[in-house]
């Protein structure tokens, strides 16, 4: 997926979003999404790179547990036939829940 295709998919999730972080002072009230590509995995053989998979993280931030929003995000990922690993944590300093979806695209 290209950056543009990923951004279009993020639009489908129906929440404010940004790549990596919002500019200082521009962060919306929760819920919101962040996405980032922390790296790539390359398939290679015989000293040739045949294909590269982008790592993609989609982070859902909420001020309370909201399973319906998680389902909304997961429905979009399913529409795009994207397999993901899901984890969750509470960020004490921000008083926010983060649901992290890790995938390769």
Where are these regions (language model features)?
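Long, contiguous binding/interaction regions
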Residues: 1-55, 61-105
């Amino acid at each position: 997926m290209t950056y543009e295709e990923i951004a279009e998919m993020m639009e489908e999730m129906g929440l404010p979003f940004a790549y990596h972080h919002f500019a200082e002072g521009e962060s919306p009230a929760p819920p919101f999404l962040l996405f980032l590509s922390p790296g790539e995995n390359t398939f290679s053989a015989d000293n040739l790179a045949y294909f590269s998979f982008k790592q993609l993280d989609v982070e859902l931030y909420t001020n309370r547990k909201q399973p319906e929003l998680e389902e909304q995000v997961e429905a979009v990922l399913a529409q795009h036939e994207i397999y993901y690993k899901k984890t969750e944590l509470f960020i004490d300093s921000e008083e926010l829940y983060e649901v992290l979806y890790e995938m390769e695209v």
